[in-house]
Amino acid sequence: MARKDQISHRGPLSGNNRSHALNATKRKFNLNLQQITLKTASGKKIRLKVSAKTKKTLRKWGQV
């Protein structure tokens, strides 16, 4: 499960690098993955790899 958000299941996107002459070369846009620890209802801790965007959303909802 490399380079995937474990909550939203988002993965890397593909696109192009563009030079000044507008030459296109393939590249990959990776997520900003961070490791967080969440507590389950039973009090058990689990570690997840989530993107910074998901982490921000969880903080907004009061989960982190």
From Swiss-Prot:
Pfam families in the cross-refs: Ribosomal_L28
Annotated region (Disordered), positions in chain: 1-23
GO cellular component: ribonucleoprotein complex; ribosome
Positions of transmembrane segments: none
Keywords, ordered alphabetically: Ribonucleoprotein, Ribosomal protein
One term of GO molecular function: structural constituent of ribosome
Annotated GO biological process: translation
UniProt-listed NCBIfam families: L28
Entries under PANTHER family matching the protein: 50S RIBOSOMAL PROTEIN L28, LARGE RIBOSOMAL SUBUNIT PROTEIN BL28A
Protein family per UniProt: Belongs to the bacterial ribosomal protein bL28 family.
Record's protein name: Large ribosomal subunit protein bL28
Source lineage: Bacteria, Bacillati, Mycoplasmatota, Mycoplasmoidales, Metamycoplasmataceae
Originating gene: rpmB
